[in-house]
């Protein structure tokens, strides 16, 4: 997930590696967090438990994704298991939740976000509120972090996990009553690679057959996805992909309504036109002001208790600060607390009792142009990575709201490698700058600039780095902020144009290193266009992505991580974590480590 202006969840420092699926081997896992935390509120299914409303209980730290091949002997209640044929079926996963007692008469959930740059699942690099109205073949149950069937009731892989076949749930409908079939999913997934759609996230389809040929001009119709009939969808992959169910759960693989797109063109996403497949329909979209959602009468699953979801839209540079004020004024029911407001909230007698921590799987980084002077010199890039006080950044500037990130992969992702970190600190940085021809900053370009999406916390961090580099290395660095959409456009435009530095964040879309190393940093993808290329790195991650031995695969990604960090085209700064205020009578609010930024109405409810 492109974390430009997205809220990231808490990254705990316990070095817990989460397993991932391997064809014919162990079950995959979806990274929930790097350690353990508490789930602050209950869901309807859990509301009948003995603990009082509003208390906390342990949240899962890691959970099994349904196996591609082989079978687990047991599974948690409500989870999905595989049979000996490799088939995954719905089982009890779609049972209606127990209706909680003492429900409030009014069930309207209010929160806030920024104006999404796009609401098209095949275009955007972050889901925003899309999961309120769209759903995929499989989904992640936020109450237990299990991958569960959604529009598909079952799926199976062939012997080497290169072909995945999904069976559709019978009787599916779009919110307007139009039948929803496997052909809708085929159409939608092919949109990811269609140049006319102009996706900012084409790497989501990289594993599908012919994706590379399509990037070179072949027809999107040749992509490795096909509706064998209305009830059967088949994906053909370029290599063994044991983690494919994780990919299929992401927003890029949501079905979108071809009949509406054909009718309305670019206006299909407006509230008056859009139809949906998820638990809600969009009733209003007052741009830069409000998105409102109400229950979808044609949703296949249990109807939510929350009857209306209202997402107030705030300016992207100040929405956290304004959101806190809105929460205190009882204008929203939950709001994230920014790092700059964290101290005040913790010291407030009332607010501190309503503050809840959540796990995370993300990294905030600086990205350097590896072909443009002076950062074309690896010594300069390493010096910038070493030339500041990390402890002061985390403890003083960010007030321990975030955790230090000397390496790029978060601790919860297989391949995490503490030993990959650069060493030597400020003294080494000074020496490297001298070797690179910039002793005490002499000869440094006066217009060296870092671009970033406007955000108060990011601004604080960059101003600290700016001062540190001046003090320690004698160099001047300019800062240039842009609103979120413009920042994304700037990043994309750098594929063919030089730059100095870009601040950017990434949060895991699923708990696998492919979503980091292959997705972001492979020279053929380059999400951040640093123009850095390392043949050894590319070779390692290409080999590792389809390996079925999970331990050996993690070792390969650890090797890749060391190359990535030592080459320093990307400077990791800190791992994300988040704290949310939640009204005492609001239950069922979850923010998982992965894709957990926006609360989902389907789990929530209010008590009296």
PLM ranges: what are they?
Residues 141-142, 146, 219-220, 231, ...:
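Gly/Pro-rich hinge or "lid" segments in bacterial periplasmic/extracellular proteins
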Residues 112-131, 151, 178, 240, ...:
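A structural "hinge/loop" feature
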Residues 110-159, 190, 273-276:
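N-terminal lobe/hinge region of extracytoplasmic solute-binding protein
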Residues 35-37, 63, 111, 287, ...:
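Ligand/substrate-recognition segments at binding pockets and active sites
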Residues 93, 375, 403-436, 454-460:
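Structural transition elements
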Residues 22-30, 286, 387-415, 456-467, ...:
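Detector for C-terminal structural segments
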Residues 268-271, 297-345:
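Ligand-site clamp/hinge motif
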Residues 1-32:
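N-terminal secretory signal peptides
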């Amino acid at each position: 997930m492109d974390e430009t202006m997205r809220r990231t969840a808490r990254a705990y420092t316990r070095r817990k590696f989460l397993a991932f699926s391997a064809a014919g081997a162990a079950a995959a896992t979806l990274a929930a967090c790097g350690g353990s935390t508490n789930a602050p509120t209950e869901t309807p299914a859990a509301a009948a438990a003995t603990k009082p409303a509003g208390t906390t209980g342990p949240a899962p730290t890691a959970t099994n994704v349904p196996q591609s091949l082989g079978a687990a002997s047991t599974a948690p209640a409500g989870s999905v298991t595989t049979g000996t044929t490799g088939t995954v079926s719905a089982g009890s996963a779609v049972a209606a939740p127990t209706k909680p007692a003492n429900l409030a008469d009014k069930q309207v959930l209010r929160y806030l976000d920024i104006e999404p740059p796009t609401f098209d699942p095949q275009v955007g690099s972050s889901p925003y509120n899309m999961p309120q109205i769209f759903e995929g073949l499989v989904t992640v149950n936020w109450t237990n972090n299990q991958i569960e069937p959604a529009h598909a009731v079952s799926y199976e892989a062939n012997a080497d996990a290169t072909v995945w076949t999904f069976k559709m749930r019978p009787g599916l409908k779009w919110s307007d009553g139009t039948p929803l079939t496997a052909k809708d999913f085929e159409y939608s997934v092919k949109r990811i690679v269609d140049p006319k759609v102009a996706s900012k996230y084409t790497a989501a389809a990289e594993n599908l057959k012919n994706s590379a040929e399509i990037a070179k001009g072949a027809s999107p119709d040749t992509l490795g996805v096909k509706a064998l009939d209305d009830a059967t969808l088949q994906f053909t992959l370029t290599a063994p992909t044991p983690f494919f169910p994780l990919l299929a759960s992401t927003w890029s693989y949501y079905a979108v309504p071809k009949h509406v797109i054909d009718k309305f063109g670019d206006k299909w996403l407006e509230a008056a036109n859009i139809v949906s497949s998820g638990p809600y329909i969009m009733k209003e979209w007052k741009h830069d002001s409000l998105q409102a959602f109400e229950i979808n009468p044609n949703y296949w699953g249990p109807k939510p208790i929350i009857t209306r979801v209202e997402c107030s839209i705030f300016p992207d540079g100040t929405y956290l600060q304004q959101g806190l004020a809105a929460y205190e004024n009882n204008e929203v029911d939950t709001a994230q607390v920014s790092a700059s407001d964290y101290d005040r909230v913790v010291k407030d007698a009332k607010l501190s009792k309503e503050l809840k921590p959540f796990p995370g799987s993300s990294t905030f980084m600086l990205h350097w142009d590896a072909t443009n002077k002076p950062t074309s010199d690896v010594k300069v890039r390493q010096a910038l990575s070493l030339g500041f006080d990390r402890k002061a950044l985390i403890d003083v500037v960010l007030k321990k709201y975030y955790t230090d990130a000397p390496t790029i992969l978060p601790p919860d992702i297989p391949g995490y490698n503490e030993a990959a970190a650069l060493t030597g600190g400020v003294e080494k940085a000074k020496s490297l700058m001298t070797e690179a021809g910039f002793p005490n900053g002499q000869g440094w370009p006066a217009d060296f600039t870092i671009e970033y999406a406007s955000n108060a916390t990011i601004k604080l961090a960059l101003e600290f780095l700016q001062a540190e580099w001046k003090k320690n290395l004698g160099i001047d660095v300019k800062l240039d902020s842009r609103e979120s959409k413009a920042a994304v456009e700037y990043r994309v435009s750098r594929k063919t144009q030089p730059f100095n530095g870009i601040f950017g964040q990434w949060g895991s879309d699923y708990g696998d290193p492919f979503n980091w190393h292959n997705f972001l940093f492979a020279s053929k993808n380059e999400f951040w266009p640093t123009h850095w290329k390392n043949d050894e790195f590319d070779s390692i991650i290409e080999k590792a992505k389809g390996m079925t031995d999970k331990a050996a695969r993690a070792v390969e990604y650890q090797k890749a991580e060391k190359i990535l960090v030592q080459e320093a085209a990307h400077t990791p700064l800190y791992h994300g974590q988040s704290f949310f205020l939640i009204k005492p009578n609001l239950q069922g609010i979850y923010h998982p480590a992965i894709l957990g930024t926006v609360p989902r109405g389907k789990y929530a409810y209010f008590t009296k």
